[in-house]
Amino acid sequence: MPFLHGFRRIIFEYQPLVDAILGSLGIQDPERQESLDRPSYVASEESRILVLTELLERKAHSPFYQEGVSNALLKMAELGLTRAADVLLRHGANLNFEDPVTYYTALHIAVLRNQPDMVELLVHHGADINRRDRIHESSPLDLASEEPERLPCLQRLLDLGADVNAADKHGKTALLHALASSDGVQIHNTENIRLLLEGGADVKATTKDGDTVFTCIIFLLGETVGGDKEEAQMINRFCFQVTRLLLAHGADPSECPAHESLTHICLKSFKLHFPLLRFLLESGAAYNCSLHGASCWSGFHIIFERLCSHPGCTEDESHTDLLRKAETVLDLMVTNSQKLQLPENFDIHPVGSLAEKIQALHFSLRQLESYPPPLKHLCRVAIRLYLQPWPVDVKVKALPLPDRLKWYLLSEHSGSMEDDI
């Protein structure tokens, strides 16, 4: 066949053997997996395996034999036929054989088709559980992390010892794959992310481009601005759930650079992202840069800058709401701080009808900073820190203390954040 070149000619040479193998198993159309679930097929599986074994023994010395059985292994991986795959492997199928088009191995294909039993079989036969494909540099764990439907394969790979923190040439780990593949509307990889974190995924993983575990969340929060209201609610709920998981496993939302800091982003738009910001502060997130302090960026400066940039008028409900939420955020900062860290040159120049209230807020913070914190405040902060992680207020209410002490331990503006989300 001189008109066929390269891998096309090779495929042409071994395709008859592949067809014969599929035919021996009663598979006419490999794309129709549902036909393999018929009771009649299951009942006759033993006889089909015998036919397959006889075929392989008869064709063992034919040209392109290994290529043919190895290609057939890809089909078995796709369909989840573990017994047939085991026979092919015992008769010379190559675990490292790549699909001529996608360059995926049988293990990659088994993951893509969510065949956890096939994954286990291939690994037990010696397949490299951390092998990356040549095109996308994806490991089986990367592929399993990208779709919620592949959760069974993700669990099986972790149980079999896949390296949860292996990264591709760009520095992207399975956790970052799971986050980047989530859109908060149609794809919710929350359980995938939970499994990876429980399996030891590093929350400090960073790509060569500087993407962190919070990059996806920050991007999705930006998508809620001016978008469909129902979709925005779904995205906010997803971001809250994932942020809660990340913080529970030690992620720091207040690290610089500012554009990669979830706390900084929520502070900049505290009216829009108020429930999530309240959760971050209740969970003990720093309101200044956690690496360099207020000299890098300060939550107090951001809040007052936003207030002063919105003059408003007395009957302006949006500005009144903005001021109310600013008071809540400031109260949470004070409630969770042993000593306030106000930025240097922290001067403001508010204008408009609410300028006096803004100035009064600023003055009260200056007063708090200028005096040593009282013992009762230090005790309040220490107890709240001890009761973390969130929800602190639920734990405070369960303490065997008089109601008056509970009231003092509670933040003045506490509420049900999950309901708000």
UniProtKB/Swiss-Prot annotation:
It holds the Pfam family SOCS_box. Residues 360-415 form the SOCS box domain. Its main location: cytoplasm. Pathway: Protein modification; protein ubiquitination. ANK repeats lie at residues 67-97, 102-131, 136-166, 170-205, 226-255, 260-289. InterPro entries: Ankyrin_rpt, Ankyrin_rpt-contain_sf, ASB6_SOCS, SOCS_box, SOCS_box-like_dom_sf. PROSITE patterns: ANK_REP_REGION (PS50297), ANK_REPEAT (PS50088), SOCS (PS50225). It is found in: Cytoplasm. Probable substrate-recognition component of a SCF-like ECS (Elongin-Cullin-SOCS-box protein) E3 ubiquitin-protein ligase complex which mediates the ubiquitination and subsequent proteasomal degradation of target proteins. May play a role in the regulation of cell proliferation and autophagy by promoting the ubiquitination and degradation of SQSTM1. PANTHER family: ANKYRIN REPEAT AND SOCS BOX PROTEIN 6. Binds APS. Identified in a complex with ELOB and ELOC. Interacts with CUL5 and RNF7. Interacts with SQSTM1. This is Ankyrin repeat and SOCS box protein 6. It comes from Pongo abelii.
